[in-house]
Each structure stands twice: as structure tokens, then as C-alpha cells.
């Protein structure tokens, strides 16, 4: 398996060759939360894969043959099949590969996890808007209040279930699908938005003990370096921290 810490490909780069038999390829970017979702599932299910990182400020021309809008993540199989959108990609991996199933077998429980994901849908946008506001020196009181309310809604679910994880007594797909945005709260400077949610904070602590989550934790100083360059519109941001 090629590591996640590979330099990005940008305009003028040559496209990678065919995906080797027995592997699946992920087109990714080290700091992207949506790609992070799919990488968590690849790791949790111990799926042999290779990583091709894409420079999102300087996308290769050929990459638009992988995704019509140039988004990440995209999975590519050795049969040249392409699967994109992070939740769809994660569900594909869970269905297509053996090992522990991350989505529940029970149809209702699977549906319940997908409904919970819908309740989470405002969080990615709000976290990004808070980050941009703080980085640009803008007032973000209302944004943070809105984010706190979303976290209060998630807190209520954990309290009602009386479980550590959103999927129950152990980690399942829904926990991995939510996690990337919670890992970023500290480096984004908005960790205080969960100060009022003890059950959610307990979930965050429990997630950090998971071997899959631990394996993909990003060094905070490297993440900060990426953000510093990203907000300077520096195309080298995506390779920050690599030799």
C-alpha cells in the first residue's frame, strides 16, 4: 500500500497508470475531511490500496476524467470503475470488501444511521465558515452559536441512546463519517463549540482510542502550516510537511 503522505499531482502532471490487480486507488488530499472519511474506511477494513493526492488549487487536466467537477475523493478499481462522493464511496467499500461490516446489517439500523447523517449535514459548512471568519478576522459569534446548536442536537441523540458511540456500543460507519470534522475543531480554533456537550466530548475522547482513528490523526503543527499557506492561496499548501 502506498502511503497517504505522497506529494500532490497538479497541472501538467502525467496521469497514473492502471490500478494494479488486487488494489483500489483513492484520489485524495491529506487535509480534506471528505477524503478522510474514505481513508478511515479503507484503514478500518484493512483494504489494500494506493493513494494519489491531488492539488486542489492546481488540478491536473486529466483528473476531470475521474470526476466531472474535479472533486475528491474518488475511488478507482482495477476494472477502471470510478466511485465518487464520500458517503457513496464508503458504502461501496463496506459492501464490496470482506471483514467486519461498518454499516449495520439490520435495514432499520442502517436507515437510522443515514438519517443521523442527514442531521449532521450543516456541520461541515458551519465549521468551514467559522474557520474562514476566524482566519479573516471577521465576527463569527452567530456562526459559532449555530454550530453549538447543531452539536446540541447530536448531544441529545447520544443522551437518548445512552451509548458511547453514535452507532451503539462500538464504533460503526456513522462514527467514521462524522469524525473528520471533530478532529479538526481544535486546529480550526473552535473546540469551545463542544464545551456544553459532555456526551459528545466523551465520544470524541473514545474515538481517539480507536486504532483506525489514531493511525490517521494529523499532526496539529503540520495542519496549521497547511492552513497558513492555504489562506495565502499558495498552491504548495497541499504538500506542506512532506520532504
Swiss-Prot record:
Optimum pH is 7.5. Residues 22-101 form the GST N-terminal domain. Glutathione binds at residues 59, 72, 85-86. GO terms for biological process: cellular response to arsenic-containing substance; glutathione metabolic process; L-ascorbic acid metabolic process; xenobiotic metabolic process. Its EC number is 2.5.1.18, 1.8.5.1, 1.20.4.2. InterPro entries: Glutathione-S-Trfase_C-like, Glutathione-S-Trfase_C_sf, Glutathione_S-Trfase, Glutathione_S-Trfase_N, GST_omega, GST_Omega/HSP26, Thioredoxin-like_sf. The active site is at residue 32. It comes from the Eukaryota. It catalyses: RX + glutathione = an S-substituted glutathione + a halide anion + H(+); L-dehydroascorbate + 2 glutathione = glutathione disulfide + L-ascorbate; methylarsonate + 2 glutathione + H(+) = methylarsonous acid + glutathione disulfide + H2O. One of its GO terms (molecular function) is methylarsonate reductase activity. Keywords: Oxidoreductase, Transferase. Belongs to the GST superfamily. Omega family. This is Glutathione S-transferase omega-2. It comes from Homo sapiens. The gene is GSTO2.
Amino acid at each position: 500500500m502506498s502511503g497517504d503522505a505522497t506529494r500532490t499531482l497538479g497541472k501538467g502532471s502525467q496521469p497514473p497508470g492502471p490500478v494494479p490487480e488486487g488494489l483500489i486507488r483513492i484520489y485524495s488530499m491529506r487535509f480534506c475531511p471528505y477524503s478522510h472519511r474514505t481513508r478511515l474506511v479503507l484503514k478500518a477494513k484493512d483494504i489494500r490500496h494506493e493513494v494519489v493526492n491531488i492539488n486542489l488549487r492546481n488540478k491536473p487536466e486529466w483528473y476531470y476524467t475521474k470526476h466531472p467537477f474535479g472533486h475528491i475523493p474518488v475511488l478507482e478499481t482495477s476494472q477502471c470503475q470510478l466511485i465518487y462522493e464520500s458517503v457513496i464511496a464508503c458504502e461501496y467499500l463496506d459492501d464490496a470488501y470482506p471483514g467486519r461490516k461498518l454499516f449495520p446489517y439490520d435495514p432499520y439500523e442502517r436507515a437510522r444511521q443515514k438519517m443521523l447523517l442527514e442531521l449532521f449535514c450543516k456541520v461541515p459548512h458551519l465549521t468551514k465558515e467559522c474557520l474562514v471568519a476566524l482566519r479573516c478576522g471577521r465576527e463569527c459569534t452567530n456562526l459559532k452559536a449555530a454550530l453549538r446548536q447543531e452539536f446540541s442536537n447530536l448531544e441529545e441523540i447520544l443522551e437518548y441512546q445512552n451509548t458511547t458511540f453514535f452507532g451503539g456500543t462500538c464504533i460503526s460507519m456513522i462514527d467514521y463519517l462524522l469524525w473528520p470534522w471533530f478532529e479538526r475543531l481544535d486546529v480550526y480554533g473552535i473546540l469551545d463549540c463542544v464545551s456544553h456537550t459532555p456526551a459528545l466530548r466523551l465520544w470524541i475522547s473514545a474515538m481517539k482510542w480507536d486504532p483506525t482513528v489514531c493511525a490517521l490523526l494529523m499532526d496539529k503543527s503540520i495542519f496549521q502550516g497547511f492552513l497558513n499557506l492555504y489562506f495565502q492561496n499558495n498552491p504548495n499548501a497541499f504538500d506542506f510537511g512532506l520532504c
